[in-house]
């Protein structure tokens, strides 16, 4: 019995030692990156990647590649091209959720490449695409291939990445974010609030802006403005037309799906984050269809959403600030009488929203940001 206890203690000590060493190794990469020792950090990442491959550890492989790419960006001139290749190579060896996240990271790398070499994409518009893009072709595409891709081809690649990522939908919904927060490129607020990896992937699908490209979307926006700009419940009730050719409709469908998924979430911060993302996207859309009717619906929608958070002061303050920001006055020396009167009305509205923020959430970041907004607006 004594021998068994000794053996068990030795085994536990060995496991803890190995675990601590692993934690230390990841911390070492982070420290090297923070100190600007990018080459050393990259080499450490490659070392951990080889170790993870030997063990068949899917998550460690993804983590090593991701951290290695961060390090490479600090000193490699063609780090974007290398990132595309790294994720293409690692995806087939990953499993489940790790593979989903890798697909979203590949889509980010492809976006970076497209944006960096936009002039090539413009020249490639006349390039004839010989065959539809598939996952196999996407993972096998060389950098030479990418130089000949049109903007439409990159959009197809992004769509394929997202569809492949969501193939693990059940696993994503059941997995807590935890350590994956560190692996996903996105805004800090979203990473902190998002409760599942399903949201991580969905968040990547929803852009910060949506540009209208066809009459169908513009008509939809106008005819269903109360639902599109309304509360989460109103937005969910909207029947979107099925049109796979419309990129904007596809985006709206994914946004609606995410809203529906969290409709009964008791965490106000999570719901508010999703509503904020939705209204941000809708704000860009109404900006593309610049009519007073749509702008009015947008403002009314924001007001309804703000009221829906009456039991969550901080979240309500966020939407009130959005309203205040929208009502910033713009008066110039040469502005006419009508313009001045209109802008003064906006200024009065802005003050009302800011006053309410101070009343319901005086210690919130929105109260502080509101003070700065007021100073900018009144002392330009």
Describe these PLM feature segments.
Residues 1-24:
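Bacterial Sec-dependent N-terminal signal peptides
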Residues 22-380:
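Extracytoplasmic/secretory-pathway proteins
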